[in-house]
């Protein structure tokens, strides 16, 4: 697909709008029964989603219009604030064994979501100064790796292993794209793997989740239930699906049907064509985001657009791979579709950064 430079911004915003609209429709049908069960009002969760979506559009406009140089200069205070927010989660109660949220006046905030923004701006600012002819020695990379390691370990200690793995993959891809020597990237990955394995084995439930993923039918009514239910929902959708609102898996048959496994609801009700449309939108989102990055007029803007696009795309692909049984079930949700106020707000903030970069593109 070849797109004129002048059309990139329009194409990107159109895909973004389609993702938001499609996600809203699928969220409504996936949350209808749960909302009725929890509150007696089938529309309660949907209206809550609309409120968060309105707020997220305001955030989008802020990040689309804010000075990127201002963000670049203020990144260290932002990192410090993010660090304290993540540390504050250890004072909050656990949910499903993880300390991911801060609760305040009935509102929950997930600081690891905010770290996506901090991570994007910090790495973009740092890598924008990189010159492989002058500073490709390992000493140049110690600072970003140390900062990343601090946040990564804190997220692991929250018992949010899946988010930690997500950030690690994102970090490695960005290092590779930044022209870091391949030998360094390889050495970092080789070092990371045993460390990651140790953290994995420290919690027996993580190991059992891996075994359930490898052999879900060994425990079909227990640890393998989510995977089997998700696959059955996707299979039952066929080509055209059962019809919007006509799915059964959301009726209490699949836990997290409106969050982690919302893709299964989509597949059951809208079929293979609905699934293909969603995946195509995510690929187009990354495609246009990437081309906005390579046609930006500075290295800093390149990384802002690239990392923001990659962060959303990578998360979406991980969630989809979980739904189709190619990754173990985790707490990774589907951007634009799944429930979660922090998630949609941060997703729209990153989308706003891409839009910000798209306002001034170059043919170079």
Curated annotation (Swiss-Prot):
Keywords: Cell cycle, Cell division, Cell inner membrane, Cell membrane, Cell shape, Cell wall biogenesis/degradation, Glycosyltransferase, Membrane, Peptidoglycan synthesis, Transferase, Transmembrane, Transmembrane helix. It catalyses: [GlcNAc-(1->4)-Mur2Ac(oyl-L-Ala-gamma-D-Glu-L-Lys-D-Ala-D-Ala)](n)-di-trans,octa-cis-undecaprenyl diphosphate + beta-D-GlcNAc-(1->4)-Mur2Ac(oyl-L-Ala-gamma-D-Glu-L-Lys-D-Ala-D-Ala)-di-trans,octa-cis-undecaprenyl diphosphate = [GlcNAc-(1->4)-Mur2Ac(oyl-L-Ala-gamma-D-Glu-L-Lys-D-Ala-D-Ala)](n+1)-di-trans,octa-cis-undecaprenyl diphosphate + di-trans,octa-cis-undecaprenyl diphosphate + H(+). Pathway: Cell wall biogenesis; peptidoglycan biosynthesis. It is an enzyme of class 2 (transferase). InterPro entries: Cell_cycle_FtsW-rel_CS, FtsW, FtsW/RodA. It is a multi-pass membrane protein. The keyword DNA damage does not apply. It is found in: Cell inner membrane. The chain crosses the membrane at residues 13-33, 44-64, 75-95, 101-121, 137-157, 161-178, 180-202, 272-292, 302-322, 334-354. Signal peptide: none annotated. Residues 34-43, 96-100, 158-160, 203-271, 323-333 are periplasmic. One of its GO terms (cellular component) is cell division site. Residues 1-12, 65-74, 122-136, 179, 293-301, 355-364 are cytoplasmic. Peptidoglycan polymerase that is essential for cell division. Belongs to the SEDS family. FtsW subfamily. This is Probable peptidoglycan glycosyltransferase FtsW. The gene is ftsW.
């Amino acid at each position: 697909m070849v797109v004129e430079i002048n059309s990139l911004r329009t194409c990107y915003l159109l895909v973004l709008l389609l993702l938001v609209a499609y996600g809203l429709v699928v969220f409504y049908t996936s949350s209808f029964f749960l909302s009725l069960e929890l509150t007696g009002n089938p529309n309660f969760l949907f209206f809550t989603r609309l409120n968060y979506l309105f707020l997220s559009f305001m955030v989008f406009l802020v990040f689309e219009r804010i000075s990127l140089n201002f963000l670049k200069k203020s990144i260290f205070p932002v990192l410090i604030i993010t660090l304290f927010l993540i540390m504050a989660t250890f004072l909050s109660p656990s949910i499903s064994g993880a300390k991911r949220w801060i609760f305040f006046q009935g509102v929950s905030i997930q600081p690891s979501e905010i770290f996506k923004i901090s991570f994007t701006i910090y790495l973009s600012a740092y890598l924008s100064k990189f010159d492989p002819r002058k500073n490709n020695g390992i000493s140049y990379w110690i600072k970003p790796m140390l900062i990343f390691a601090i946040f990564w370990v804190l997220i692991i200690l929250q018992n949010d292993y899946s988010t930690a793995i997500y950030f690690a993959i994102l970090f490695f891809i960005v290092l590779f794209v930044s022209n870091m020597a391949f030998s360094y990237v390889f050495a970092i990955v080789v070092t990371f793997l045993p460390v990651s394995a140790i953290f994995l084995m420290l919690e027996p439930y993580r190991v059992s989740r891996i075994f359930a993923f490898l052999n879900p039918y060994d425990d079909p009514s227990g640890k393998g239930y989510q995977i089997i239910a998700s696959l059955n929902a996707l299979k039952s959708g066929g080509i055209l699906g059962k019809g919007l609102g006509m799915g059964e898996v959301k009726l209490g048959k699949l836990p997290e049907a409106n969050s982690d496994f919302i893709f299964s609801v989509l597949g059951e009700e809208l079929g293979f064509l609905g699934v293909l449309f969603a995946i195509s939108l995510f690929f187009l989102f990354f495609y246009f985001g990437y081309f906005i990055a390579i046609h930006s007029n500075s290295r800093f803007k390149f990384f802002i657009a690239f990392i923001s696009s990659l962060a959303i795309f990578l998360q979406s692909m991980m969630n989809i791979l979980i739904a189709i049984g190619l990754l173990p079930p985790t707490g990774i949700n589907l951007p634009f579709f799944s429930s979660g106020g922090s998630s949609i707000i941060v997703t729209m903030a990153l989308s706003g950064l891409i839009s910000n970069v798209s306002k001034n593109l170059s043919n170079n």
